[in-house]
């Protein structure tokens, strides 16, 4: 609990309270000896604790992030602003970004998840874009204990509660259950927006004397030190830190969004910059806006709208109260901006101005309470080159491939369809409004969500993907696969992958083996992005995802957006008609290490990860996209967790269509998780043209049927089950587990 009476500079030094706020002894010493050359007061120490946190400064991850490929002729705005922007032609652009809210969701799951959604929405409309879609990538422990069930229910309710109320459809995402996330769930939210390129905004504060205007909700004591909390290792003691979790109001956010977009579209001649007050609150938005412009800033904290009495400068600057934005407006145009926000019933107050020089000055009750170099806050945090050591777990890996023996292929399929990660998530995403705004073409449950772009023939395909198990067994190859699977989902939906955003969820970077996971997987992601021409344009780093010293699997969530140039090319994963030919594109090997089958049969994952070839992956994706654009494909579904047989079953379920298939593969290989594969259905009329284009890379399996039967004859056994019964198992598993 913070003292009401401010600590003196010597009190701060002697009590070492800065440690509680996230600064190390070395960082405090750097601040006093080099940056300020004096002892900082309580407020100044607080400012640096927030801005030098990993969440704001990327001090542990910046050397890693430099490895990412961020180029491409389609990139209009890369990393560095509130969100990235990619050209989609016709003077339009897509804006997207993902953010993590892991630690807050662990201690206060409803508000943690809800405010994660709210924050990422603000990042999108701060760029001038109207948000059109949300996605969520969730990781929980096994859904068997009461606390995990509580987390799941509250996180899902928080996401739906915020997104539904503000009127933005949730059209995709992914949910995985694994003991690795038992104490440290991951809640990653992604938002996508559309804008005309003429409306692009930036977070900057330029022009000496121009006004700095605070808009939106009043400031309270919620979320103070939230950036530092999000940057710290999680343990049981942290579960009491609910005051570090923000409280959201989606109805306020809706008003704020509409008001800000009105200012951007109708008052652009006086608007200089706009930025969300996110992590580290007012200090982050104001210092970053000034630093990017090479300006100084002077703020009067007495003018900050407050919902609680007696707030200190420390609290006012570091509060992470939600639904707040900061604008820089031409001097003399303040009243013009006030009128817009008054119309929506929102506070709009000039709290400061842009100044000459490079100082960041705060005044409170007529006194100067902070006077520091603005760049020291925003861009001069120490950057650490962490030690990297190959993890012991990789040195002790078995070189042998896990080879399952299936006594009962159909029985194994029944069990597979009921695994929490494989089973239908409709009971979760069914609570989200996926069709508000009436632009959703493909709802959650297919490979990617698809949303049309109004007044055009275009659509966007969006997805989130990563398999942490693969990265646990091989961080670099697992990073490549994460990007590849996201691209597969876009291509299977008829889209051309454009770019990615990421949430890099890892353990403690000060542990050499944990830093190895981060660094190696980043190299894999970078290589795949360059090959697929999908630059990283935005993202977020969430480190110290450890509970009592136990780290999660390395989990770099990849959010990808693709462009479908013609809506006729939109493709879904479900079989459409009886009598269609069914193919698998790509070869199937005995790849079981890290697979869902290995976990299901042995309770763990182990061994060296199977081989993966990005060139083969890229070729297969290009072949499929060409076939789709030529009108040769009725359905396409990427093969991922659970293998080929699970993919086939999932394609049967939506239309209750059966299949009669045959293969010379052994039954076990139908559960292998070899990459670079798709299950494709083709009408008889297109079969010859399809085979002419795709041979020798496709294998004919058989045909869809009008029967209620999934029958696959393999080299040694047959899968034989009613589609309706298999679907019942698949749909009922998760609701049963979560009771």
Curated annotation (Swiss-Prot):
Mg(2+) 2 binds at residues 123, 276. One of its GO terms (molecular function) is phosphoribosylformylglycinamidine synthase activity. Mg(2+) 1 binds at residues 99, 540. Part of the phosphoribosylformylglycinamidine synthase complex involved in the purines biosynthetic pathway. Catalyzes the ATP-dependent conversion of formylglycinamide ribonucleotide (FGAR) and glutamine to yield formylglycinamidine ribonucleotide (FGAM) and glutamate. The FGAM synthase complex is composed of three subunits. PurQ produces an ammonia molecule by converting glutamine to glutamate. PurL transfers the ammonia molecule to FGAR to form FGAM in an ATP-dependent manner. Coiled coil: none annotated. It is found in: Cytoplasm. Monomer. Part of the FGAM synthase complex composed of 1 PurL, 1 PurQ and 2 PurS subunits. The active site is at residues 55, 101. This is Phosphoribosylformylglycinamidine synthase subunit PurL. It comes from Lactiplantibacillus plantarum (strain ATCC BAA-793 / NCIMB 8826 / WCFS1) (Lactobacillus plantarum). Pathway: Purine metabolism; IMP biosynthesis via de novo pathway; 5-amino-1-(5-phospho-D-ribosyl)imidazole from N(2)-formyl-N(1)-(5-phospho-D-ribosyl)glycinamide: step 1/2. Its main location: cytoplasm. It is an enzyme of class 6 (ligase). Keywords: ATP-binding, Cytoplasm, Ligase, Magnesium, Metal-binding, Nucleotide-binding, Purine biosynthesis. It catalyses: N(2)-formyl-N(1)-(5-phospho-beta-D-ribosyl)glycinamide + L-glutamine + ATP + H2O = 2-formamido-N(1)-(5-O-phospho-beta-D-ribosyl)acetamidine + L-glutamate + ADP + phosphate + H(+). ATP binds at residues 58, 97, 502, 539. CDD domains: PurL_repeat1, PurL_repeat2.
